[in-house]
């Protein structure tokens, strides 16, 4: 039984996963897709499971797809990565199944974005369908800021960045909630608190973690949403809403978990490797 740990940049999380694989005495290889090519051949089938960890969404997606072609079980699957990597696709799946999401309008041109701003009213959020760590997520307080954002986005080469997700601005309790699910189990949740010099709660932007109590509604919402998206190891960003209770804002298919471990004292890497061993390496 052998595991592939697929990376492009080795962060603390990947080091912890490797350490857990060694602790559980599982044979594994690290495949760095930023340095090594992945051929379409059956030789990759020597791996029973691949843990997909590239930072780049496209590297993660394509690595998962190539390994799947050789019969390798990937965590996460290319289908899951594709869904999580595009916020519009994520919202579409969730909204169809009745999962609360932020009120959103999709605008596919500059003119459409201006009309969406008018419909939504200020302040509002404008973000592209792709991206992580809060990049290009804009809080727009008036039409002048909005026009500036639209002009800048139009100059970007990637067509997806010219698509606008225009959303209500939610700032209830000045925090958001991040949860981690492994398999069908909610591992836990913690709050990401907005720092004084930011309006976003991302840990990468200075947000700081704290413990929270997970109530039944939060657990129910997160697990139902995860069953729709289909991820085996995902983090879910949740916002507390004054009228909707909990809304799902985003799924992450290659979850970072330093902040989660700090807030909850749960060893995520060991939980993940235990799940892999118990479900796929018996």
Curated annotation (Swiss-Prot):
Entry's family note: Belongs to the RimK family. LysX subfamily.
Subunit structure comment from the entry: Homotetramer. Interacts with LysW.
Catalyzed reaction equations: [amino-group carrier protein]-C-terminal-L-glutamate + L-glutamate + ATP = [amino-group carrier protein]-C-terminal-gamma-(L-glutamyl)-L-glutamate + ADP + phosphate + H(+)
Protein residues bound to ATP: 87, 127, 131-137, 167-178, 202
Gene3D superfamilies, per database record: 3.40.50.20, ATP-grasp fold, A domain, ATP-grasp fold, B domain
Enzyme Commission number(s) from the entry: 6.3.2.-
Traits of the deletion mutant: Cells lacking this gene require arginine for growth.
Domain ATP-grasp per the UniProt entry, residue ranges: 91-277
Function: Catalyzes the ATP-dependent formation of a covalent bond between the amino group of glutamate and the gamma-carboxyl group of the C-terminal glutamate residue in LysW.
EC class of the enzyme, as a word: ligase
Organism whose genome encodes this protein: Sulfolobus acidocaldarius (strain ATCC 33909 / DSM 639 / JCM 8929 / NBRC 15157 / NCIMB 11770)
Any one GO cellular component localisation term in the record: cytoplasm
Identification of the protein by name: Glutamate--LysW ligase ArgX
Residues given in the record as substrate binding sites: 192, 203-204, 256-260
Sequence motif GF motif that is essential for ArgX substrate specificity, residues: 259-260
Gene name per UniProt: argX
MF GO annotations: ATP binding; coenzyme F420-2 alpha-glutamyl ligase activity; metal ion binding
Residues annotated for Mg(2+) 1 binding in this entry: 237, 250
Sites where the protein binds Mg(2+) 2: 250, 252
Pathway note: Amino-acid biosynthesis; L-arginine biosynthesis
GO biological process, one term: lysine biosynthetic process
Record note on cofactor: Binds 2 magnesium ions per subunit.
